[in-house]
Swiss-Prot record:
Lineage: Bacteria, Pseudomonadati, Pseudomonadota, Gammaproteobacteria, Pseudomonadales
Pfam families: DUF489
InterPro entries linked: HflD, HflD-like_sf
Location(s), subcellular: Cytoplasm; Cell inner membrane
Species per Swiss-Prot/TrEMBL record: Pseudomonas aeruginosa (strain ATCC 15692 / DSM 22644 / CIP 104116 / JCM 14847 / LMG 12228 / 1C / PRS 101 / PAO1)
Membrane topology label: Peripheral membrane protein
Designated name of the protein: High frequency lysogenization protein HflD homolog
One GO location term (cellular component): cytoplasm
Protein family: Belongs to the HflD family.
Amino acid sequence: MSDPRQQLIALGAVFESAALVDKLARTGQISEAPLGCMLGSLLARNPASTLDVYGGDSLNLRDGFKALASALERKPGSLQREPLRYALAMLTLERQLDKRGDMLDLIGQRLDQVEQQVQHFGLVHENVIASFASIYQDTLSTFRQRIQVHGDMRHLQVSSNAARIRALLLAGIRSARLWRQLGGSRWQMVFSRRRLLNELYPLLRG
């Protein structure tokens, strides 16, 4: 697997988180499978490939790849504006997080604790999701620049939805970190759009 392809998988996961946050904020519902995929990526240890972080199947990131393609194609009619806004905000927050070694250590310690919880309850249990959400609240949401989620207030005010949104933002920022570790940069999204799309279309076809 080429480096650009690995970068795209990680970037697609950022957009997958963004798309799920948007859907949850607007409708109050998302499927358990994509939620589990993104939460599982937070606990992935020593994966054989980037795709293995996300369950080993590009179909798990299909909505993210679609949202990323719409951003790169720049067609006003198909652009998914809110997912794009969330994704760019996650990339920005990850850069701020990178300067905070103390916070990275804390997140790592807290994720170790969640991993033990998962063994008892399962990955998408509300207690586990609440723990992921509290990590986000105690760390990333303390930055001056925060991610403002827009949607239907009836859904956003439900505590379980708020927890899932925070957990998904944490997963998206983890994927943003992986993307940058693989050599990804925001300049590529500006100056290498055609090359990225050529790599992305086969992933969209599964």
